[in-house]
A protein has these predicted regions:
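Terminal, contiguous helix-loop blocks that mediate binding/assembly
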Residues: 26-40, 137, 159-197, 202-659
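Catalytic-core segments of thiol-dependent peptidases
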Residues: 85-187, 199-200, 205, 222-223
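Bacterial N-terminal signal peptides that target proteins for export
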Residues: 1-8
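C-terminal motif of bacterial Sec signal peptides marking the signal peptidase cleavage site
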Residues: 17-20
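N-terminal extension/subdomain marker
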Residues: 22-140
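Alpha-helical transmembrane segments
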Residues: 11-15
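Structural recognition of the beta-strand scaffold that forms the well-ordered cores
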Residues: 46-51, 80-85, 144-148, 193-197, ...
């Protein structure tokens, strides 16, 4: 059994290595004309569309698809759209040239190419600034909207990842630099009516603060967007029919059109899109800073606060994937985080939710993003120093910057200590932040079998208070066939956090696609539903199937397939829906019992998708299964329990502790 324990431990480590739209080439043409002068082109509304095609265009033609949606609208003479295209190695239409930055105008007269520049980096603030100046000079309007189209990476990584320049992106401070060079900025009279992000993950409190003297309204998504993105036909038609609408009305129209478009494509389960009134952001920033201050003072008074907050953050709705498998965006819904931290932070949590409700004037969200309040914030789920450093460069809140700095480094610099002193902290030194490494030994936490045959881990309240989560890993074992198969990670265990006692809930069942056992990894847990990542090959390409378990009806639902974050922090915008005839191959980590303990990723079962393809639990039948509890602290350090072994024979489960 000692050999089996090593296999299970290696499986848990190896598991961390796992990691729609498609448009045919579009017929499109634009007459080449000179750019208009400002006076002759003045309109009620001008939309400045910064279209960084990236691999969304070169692989799938998503940008061409949205431009085609625009061209299907008969615009009135009150509305015009100025589009800059770039950032893609290839365009799926007959007009755009990937070797140039091109500027087009679409209005009541037609579609025109009005300017060309040599290829430039769409992830550069200078490129954006030049486009904004061009639009301001040649195509002014009474009301303006600036729309960014591409990938998004949240507060730290920004948006507009140019695949021609190593996926360089515009960070929030670079967005600000570009607008500042093109416009006179003012919180009382911002130059832009609406700034919109048709990207993933950019409805953040840091984004809102960045644009508060640039625009009146922010329209963006907290979650990753489906590949279909915004429905340009819908909202541009509405704007053309009613050019007298203001920014708030336009934001609502964009949200409603987006929701309808996603529903039509059957990808609306996890959507989010919100409209934020940036003139009201000041009250939210004050409340957000107060929340951070209360958290920081709690943490320096008792560093055990960090795992307690970590448990609340893991329950709060978070976006883009925050696991080793999917990558970390470190973005969590601000309102839901405040809700879960209400007992930890009673003086400030409710004020945050009230301020959010005041400044988020409209939002849409799918049934499995029901807790979205409109803006997300940064939370360091992975305690990564490099990612935290990126956050510190753009953070809209000093208190949370110092809070995460203390959690990750265990100390604060002189500025951090001065900030602490300014909010009432009087000691000269900070206590060390406790981690599992401080109490770890060569022995794993013991497991015993109680009188009812349950595997129990009793770590006591002191160790439990260091943890932000407890999970389990399950492996199928066949000693006769000399094989061990990792089944996955879940939280379906009984938890007594107050006393530090955790107990298995093994029932001999596991998740499967059409009856074929699947590796499944918990990536989000809440009282209403859990979300799982299931690695597969889909028509020969590796994807993560997204599956939810809905506690309301006790059913699993397949939402679609998506790839995780890439090395640049870029979220995959293309949620692929399974289609009848698609080929799925399940992926598992497999090791021999007698070999060198190394796990390898194997293709297991291959089958075709049908109209009735579904995910559900199946009885695994007779066999031997091994489980370990997984303990995770506030720093994302992980340690393990000893192993429990379940032997199932004729439907009867016998449990024993491994020797």
């Amino acid at each position: 059994m000692k050999k089996l324990w090593k296999i299970l431990l290696l499986a848990a480590v190896c598991a961390s290595l796992l990691t729609g739209c498609f448009v045919e080439d579009v017929e499109m043409s634009a007459e080449r004309v000179e750019a208009a002068s400002g006076e002759e082109s003045y309109a009620d509304w001008a939309v400045y569309w910064y279209n960084c095609g990236s691999d969304l265009e070169s692989k799938w033609g998503c940008a061409s698809g949205d431009i085609k949606e625009m061209l299907s609208v008969d615009l009135s003479d009150k509305v015009q759209v100025v589009v800059q295209t770039g950032g893609a190695k290839k365009w799926h239409n007959t007009q755009m040239d990937a070797d140039k930055l091109q500027r087009y105008v679409y209005n009541s007269d037609g579609f025109y190419l009005v300017d060309e520049q040599p290829r430039g980096n769409m992830g550069s603030p200078e490129t954006l600034a030049d486009f904004l100046k061009f639009c301001k000079s040649h195509y002014p309007a009474a009301h303006t909207a600036v729309v960014f189209w591409n990938h998004g990476g949240g507060s730290v990584d920004g948006a507009a990842f140019d695949e021609n320049y190593d996926y360089d992106s515009l960070k929030l401070n670079e967005f600000y630099q570009a607008f500042q060079s093109a416009f006179d900025l003012s919180t009382d009279n911002p130059p832009i009516d609406v700034v919109g992000f048709d990207t993933c993950l950019m409805a953040t409190v840091d984004t809102a603060y960045t644009f508060c003297d640039i625009a009146r309204y922010l329209v963006a998504s907290e979650e990753t967007e489906p590949g279909c993105g915004w429905y340009y036909t819908g909202w541009l038609e509405a704007l053309s029919e009613n050019p007298g609408m203001d920014g708030a009305e336009l934001g609502k129209v964009i949200c409603d059109a987006f929701e309808k478009g996603c529903q039509d494509e059957e990808v609306a389960d996890e959507i989010t899109l919100s409209v934020t009134d940036l003139s009201r952001i000041g009250n939210l920033m004050e409340a957000y800073e107060s929340l951070g201050q209360e958290a920081l003072l709690n943490a320096v008074d008792n560093p055990g606060f960090f795992p307690a907050m970590g448990r609340m953050a893991s329950r709060a709705e978070n976006y883009g994937g925050n696991t080793e498998d999917e990558g970390y965006t470190n973005m969590v819904d601000l309102g839901d985080l405040a809700y879960h931290c209400a007992e930890l932070l009673p003086e400030s949590a409710n004020a945050v939710r009230e301020a959010l409700a005041d400044c988020v004037t409209y939002k849409v969200n799918g049934p499995y993003r029901a807790k979205a309040t409109g803006l997300s914030c940064y939370y360091s789920y992975n305690s990564d120093k490099k990612d935290y450093s990126g956050f510190a460069d753009i953070a809209a809140c000093d208190a949370f910057t110092y809070l995460y700095g203390y959690e990750i480094d265990g100390s604060l610099d002189d500025r951090g200590m001065a900030y602490l002193n300014g909010i009432g902290f009087e000691r000269e030194e900070l206590a060390e932040v406790p981690t599992l490494e401080d109490v770890s030994t060569e022995q794993d936490y013991p497991v015993y079998i109680d009188d009812e045959g349950n595997a129990v881990m009793d770590i006591g309240p002191d160790i439990a208070n260091m943890l932000k989560g407890v999970y389990f890993r399950l492996v199928y074992v066949d000693e006769e066939q000399d094989i061990a198969i990792l089944l996955g990670r879940d939280n379906n265990i009984y938890m007594d956090w107050e006393n530090g006692v955790f107990q298995d809930n093994f029932q001999g069942t596991w998740g499967a696609i059409d009856g074929y056992l699947a590796y499944m990894e918990l990536i989000y847990e809440s009282n209403d539903y859990n979300t799982y990542m299931v690695p597969i090959l889909l028509n020969g390409e590796k994807y993560n199937l997204r599956v939810v378990y809905d506690y309301n009806d006790g059913q699993y639902y397949i939402l679609g397939a998506r790839k995780g974050l890439d090395a640049n922090g870029m979220a995959d915008k293309n949620l692929v829906q399974l289609q009848p005839g698609d080929e799925i191959t399940t992926l598992h980590y497999v090791a021999s019992m007698s070999g060198d303990d190394s796990f390898a990723l194997y293709e297991m079962d291959t089958f075709k998708v049908t109209e009735s393809t579904s995910f559900g639990e199946v009885d695994m039948g007779d066999g031997e299964f091994a489980m370990m509890f997984e303990l995770v602290d506030a720093h994302n350090n992980t340690t393990w329990s000893e192993m429990a072994v379940f032997t199932v024979e004729d439907g009867v489960i016998r449990t024993e502790a491994a020797e």
